[in-house]
Every structure is written in structure tokens, then in C-alpha cells.
Amino acid sequence: MEKREELYRGKAKSVYKTDDADRLILLFRNDTSAFDGKRIEQLDRKGMVNNKFNAFIMQKLEEAGVPTQFDKLLGDNECLVKKLDMIPVECVVRNYAAGSLVKRLGIEEGTRLNPYTFELFLKDDAKGDPFINESHVVAFGWGTAEQLVRMKELSIKVNEVLTKLFDDAGLLLVDFKLEFGVFHGEIVLGDEFSPDGCRLWDKDTRKKMDKDRFRQGLGDVIEAYEEVANRLGVPL
């Protein structure tokens, strides 16, 4: 597989074309951002940890029947993925109140949500990733009603699989975001799954083990990521 020119550079990953029109290379960088890219720092080992963490999670999801873009690891910081036609919508599943939900509704952080909540946000940093609903997605042509049904089904399946996986490792899966795209007509899970895009708390102490450590200035960000990976058995 030949790596070619950079196609896209995001806040923490770079995407490269390959000699296969259906495949891309994701490069996980050490960049760490918060507040829609307004704060960016370099954290040693972060790209490696997130790349291998993502590979582990995507493989677990594939085994559970969730189609993903992940193909294989290429190195410490790179993986090969399917080239998706991305849907510009973030699906957020929440099992406990945290983050923007607490700010929007004034709910106490850590409140158990039973059942979980499912939310949609437009993927647009310039607009602050606004909260949207299903009718917006269809009306503005960001996706179809059928695609939304499948995205929700897969989000719920991901929640079922990963809630148990993290629980077995002594962790609470507080919330997470997912992005989907289309590959040869099929809705497929894209982007990544790492502590950058979810909230994980220690089940006993409620210690935060995710990017909130960076957002809130708690320190030991990568140490927390590595502890989560080690609890899950991710080979780093």
C-alpha cells in the first residue's frame, strides 16, 4: 500500500490518500485540542496510544457485528481504513450526565441516565457543532431518514458492547460520540474511538480517565489513557 498526498488535516489526525481509491491512511498525531481547537498542545505518546486503542475497539465492534472503516494497523501511529463518504453529523450516546448536557439542562454531573440518551450534533467547528434533530438532518440534506435509523441502531449496539467491555475493566462509559459514513452503499462506523471522543470514569472513585483531564487541567492525561488501555488489555 503506497502512501500518497495528505487529503485532510484535522485537529488530531491527518488523512492520506493511497494507491487504492477505496483506502486511506489515518495518522494519529500527538496534537491535543479542546474548545473547538482554541487550545492545542502536544502530548508525547498520544498518537500511538490512540491509534492502538482505536484499533482494539474497532476490532471488538467488528466482532460484535458493527461494520467499521478500520482495516489494519500499519505502525505505531498509522492505520489503514476504508474511504467513506462521511455524513456530517455526530451521534452522541450518554449513559451519565456530563459535558454539554449538564450545561444545557442544569443536571448534576454524574446523574445516571436510564435509559441512555441519543443526540445529534452538526459536525461544524465554525458553528460550534450545534445541537440538531433528525428533521434538520433530512431537511438540509446531511443524511436520509433511512441512514439516520441505521446510525441510531449502530450507536445503540456500540453502547451495548462497549458498556460491558469497560465495565469489566472497572470503568464507566459515561458518554461518547460516533461518526458514520457510507461505503459501497452501507452505513459504516468511521473516524475513531479513543479517550479523545468519549468519557470514561473509574467505577469506584469516579476519577476521570479521558480528555476531560486536558480540558479541565487535571494533568496526567496520557497516563490516564494508558491506564485505560492497560485495563482493557490493549497492546501498546
From Swiss-Prot:
Cellular component, GO annotation: cytosol
Catalyses which reaction(s): 5-amino-1-(5-phospho-D-ribosyl)imidazole-4-carboxylate + L-aspartate + ATP = (2S)-2-[5-amino-1-(5-phospho-beta-D-ribosyl)imidazole-4-carboxamido]succinate + ADP + phosphate + 2 H(+)
Listed Pfam families: SAICAR_synt
Source taxon at top rank: Bacteria
Enzyme class (EC, first level): ligase
Alphabetical GO biological process terms: 'de novo' IMP biosynthetic process; cobalamin biosynthetic process
Family statement drawn from the similarity comment of this UniProt entry: Belongs to the SAICAR synthetase family.
Protein name (database record): Phosphoribosylaminoimidazole-succinocarboxamide synthase
Organism: Pseudomonas savastanoi pv. phaseolicola (strain 1448A / Race 6)
